Amino acid sequence: MWTHGWWTHGERWPVKPAEARTWARARGYGQYTQAAVSTDGVHFTVQPAITKTSYLRVFTRGSSSFGVSRLGLVSRAQSPLAEFTPGPNLFRETPYAGRVRHVALVVRGNRLLVFFTAIGDAPERIFMSKVELVADWSEWRASGFTEVLTPETAYECANLPNLPSEGGDINVPVKQIRDPFVFEDAGRAFVFYSTCGEQGIAAAEIDVP
């Protein structure tokens, strides 16, 4: 399991969240990723390697592990438990460059499907893009953007104003869906996502090519 959170060298944080973020960023800290392993799904042992990116989603190809994280950055490691080395942005030279919030990954042969939402969209909603997994991973690029889900129901706050989303957390209901995760079982695919910004969790069955 890969987890992320604000990381420091052990210094004590300010108590209030807004002050803590300002304090951490001024010292070069950020939301980083670590792996944790478990044999029973209950008790986990945190691994020492720290990857300096957040919201990392990982898949294995050949002898390497690859991850895609916030903003669409792709990275590589020789082991899924090692520190990942940053590479290019999958979304470079696209309208989503630097705006990708969270991603979900599905591998189909030599193609990677990336489900994501983008900061600044009105409304923020889920898209799918395709990445052809050519031999040189520095050449991987996202293309072919398809809308998967957009807020349409009351539990997704579709009745609220249609405003561009912003980076960071949100503590009030808004017309946005975020944070996709794709789960496949017995030939069916479901996407789990947060609703009204970050006020709930929903799921929908989708067609995954």
Task: List the predicted regions and their residue ranges.
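Carbohydrate-active catalytic/glycan-binding domains of CAZyme proteins
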Residues: M1-P209
